[in-house]
Amino acid sequence: MLRQLYQSLALVAAVHATGIFANGVDIESLFGPYLSPGTEIAEPTDADFSTVASPRWSEWKPPTWTGAIKPKTERDLQKIVRIAAAHNLPFMATNGGHGTSLIYGTVKGIDVNLENFNSVKIDIEKNTLTVGGGTKLGDITEPLYNAGKAIPRGNSPCVGVIGATIGGGIGFNTGLFGLGVDALVEVRLVTATGDIVTVSEKRHPDLLWAIRGAGANFGIITEATFRMSDQPNNGDAVIGSFVYPAEGALAVFEELQSLDYVLPADLGVQLSIAYNRTINASELTVDMKHFGPWDTFVPHWNTAERLKPIARTIKNVTLVELYAGLDGPCQSGVYVSGGTTGLGRTDPQTMKEVMDEMTAFYEAHPGFLGQTLFQRYANNNTLKTPLSTAVYPWRDTKNFWLHENIYTDPALEQPSIDLLLSLRKKLQATSGFDEPHIYVNYAFGDEGPAAWWGADNLPRLRRLKRRWDPKGLFGRGTPIF
């Protein structure tokens, strides 16, 4: 199944990529005369290509860029879309460069770097935050903190705000505020015709429904507006990190199971399985982010201590400090592939089997640097929002499993993929769900649209795709088909 999907997508990409580049037309001549001063254009052979193209987090199956454009204005984006469409030139708008779907490896086209669309505007009177298409999560942390406001958001500061949101938008504060898509109230969108439309609950509400979960498939979002909430605990938080040996992991997994129905909204928990090469043993780390006062964190600390950690770190921090410390995915230059499945229940024995399989893999492959994460965020507020408001379907997910294969030796590619698929199969079998719940931002790429957006949503989603993007210009990483 994986090989067939990959081959069919590669064929589609090859068909779209033929034509103008094969005829030797360069993008400077094609686009340059129509774009504003300050717009940068580069071919892959140009010395400045790496500064014009968006930097990419992972070396695994990257797109093949036939050129790069860094536009200055919204009008530039309109012209880029129109010219590219007229000449059958594939392109992709990029910001953080964090997508790791295997489908990206089939993409061949122009990188449209949104770096110049980095803007943050807070309107206290309207209680909204508006960001540009090139804004990263790290850019909004301090302005929101200073304003005493918050939005549901992803974690890592180098990830794009809009990209993280339009796939769903989960993070440590999901328990308090729900999903990012639920706070998204309006976008400005460059469509497949090069027109700009404002999309909101009053204007094109059907399209807003689709953007809330599958937004990359419908155009280039130049600006997005979010409804804000008041900042929790005056912008202060408590973070705790507890490390456990492999032999104590089952007890930790059983404790996580006890949180299936009682996780407090102000507590985000992440478990990570990794390998300590110094002592040659797997370790389980429990990271807690508590968006409340110290005294309400103490019971969670006591529980963590009862499980006998071998190391711990506990600190009072501001929200600015909390998010600045989540910069792990900001490192680049290595091969990273990822995969996921959503869990509706915690099965301690399966999680222990995952850790055992990871340990065996670490020992067999000393160059493997990857990790497996279990992200547990309360979903009470997520469930309060009706399913009908967004194409994002998996509100009943309690635990987001994210596996990251990380390595520098390309020879580890296939063994690490085999590991990912094996772990995914194990976890899916005891997830409590009959159908895979795939958080599209974490997708490996072989799961398909029904797993990303729900089979019941596909007829409506496909109709909207045919209406707004009939030639399939957008959404090349996780396409609607």
UniProtKB/Swiss-Prot annotation:
Keywords: FAD, Flavoprotein, Glycoprotein, Oxidoreductase, Signal. Its EC number is 1.-.-.-. It is an enzyme of class 1 (oxidoreductase). Azasperpyranones display potential anti-cancer activities. Azasperpyranones A, C, D, and F exhibit potent growth-inhibitory activity against the A549, HepG2, HCT-116, and HL-60 cell lines, with IC(50) values of 2.39-14.42 mm, respectively. Moreover, azasperpyranone D significantly inhibits HCT-116 xenograft tumor growth in BALB/c-nu mice. In addition, azasperpyranones A and C can bind with four kinds of therapeutic targets for cancer, eEF2K, FGFR, survivin, and TNF-a. Residues 58-231 form the FAD-binding PCMH-type domain. It comes from the Eukaryota. Induction: Expression is induced by the azasperpyranone cluster A-specific transcription factor ATEG_07666 which is itself regulated by the azasperpyranone transcriptional regulator ATEG_07667. Disruption phenotype: Does not affect the production of azasperpyranone A. Residues 1-17 form the signal peptide. The keyword Oxidoreductase applies. PROSITE patterns: FAD_PCMH. One of its GO terms (molecular function) is oxidoreductase activity. Glycans are attached at N276, N280, N316, N380. Belongs to the oxygen-dependent FAD-linked oxidoreductase family. FAD-linked oxidoreductase; part of the cluster B that mediates the biosynthesis of azasperpyranones, members of the azaphilone family that exhibit anti-cancer activities. Azasperpyranones are synthesized by 2 clusters, A and B. Cluster A is responsible for the production of the polyhydric phenol moiety while the azaphilonoid scaffold is produced by the cluster B. The non-reducing polyketide synthase ATEG_03629 produces 5-methyl orsellinic acid, which is then reduced to 5-methyl orsellinic aldehyde by the NRPS-like protein ATEG_03630. This is FAD-linked oxidoreductase ATEG_07660.
